A protein has these predicted regions:
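Hydrophobic "anchor" residues
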Residues: 43-44
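Short, well-ordered amphipathic alpha-helical segments that serve as non-catalytic structural scaffolds
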Residues: 15-19, 58-65
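Histidine- and/or cysteine-centered catalytic micro-motif in compact active-site loops
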Residues: 38-40, 49-50
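Short beta-strand scaffold segments in enzyme catalytic cores
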Residues: 29-39
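Feature captures the catalytic cores and cofactor-binding loops of soluble hydro-lyases/lyases
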Residues: 61, 65-70, 87
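Compact, glycine-rich, soluble single-domain proteins
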Residues: 48-61
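C-terminal binding/interaction regions
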Residues: 1-26, 71-117
Length: 117
């Protein structure tokens, strides 16, 4: 169900944008997606994708960072693409499966018809 974004959601988007702006590397195609996940405790964790033969999505890196800090319950996640992170993108199939298996109650921020929800 689509819901309007909150100030906390915009803060999460801004963190995903910040991390990709700092780490964007299109020349080597290493880091082109940033993600941020908010735990139910309110902490935000960010990550960038890692290109390799098998790769790792930015969402997976952000979730891994949260788990290594003891977080297990998540509220919301978002991924952005591009040098400035202006494009909000949906999770890939693998990330959707991870979200379903490990955090089924986690909200995903999406862009639908040019509007974020």
């Amino acid at each position: 169900m689509m819901q309007p974004l909150t100030d906390k959601d915009y803060e999460l988007i801004a963190e995903a944008q910040r991390v990709i702006r700092l780490n964007y590397d299109a020349i080597h195609e290493n880091h082109t997606v940033g993600a941020a996940v908010r735990s139910k405790s309110g902490k935000i964790f960010a990550g960038v994708n890692m290109y390799s033969m098998h790769g790792a999505c930015a969402e997976q890196i952000a979730i891994g960072a949260a788990v290594t800090q003891g977080e297990r319950d998540f509220d919301t996640i978002v991924a952005v693409r591009g040098k400035d992170g202006s494009e909000i993108i949906p999770p890939c199939g693998n990330c959707r499966q991870i979200l379903h298996d490990y955090m089924p109650d986690c909200e995903v921020i999406l862009s639908v018809a040019g509007q974020h929800a």
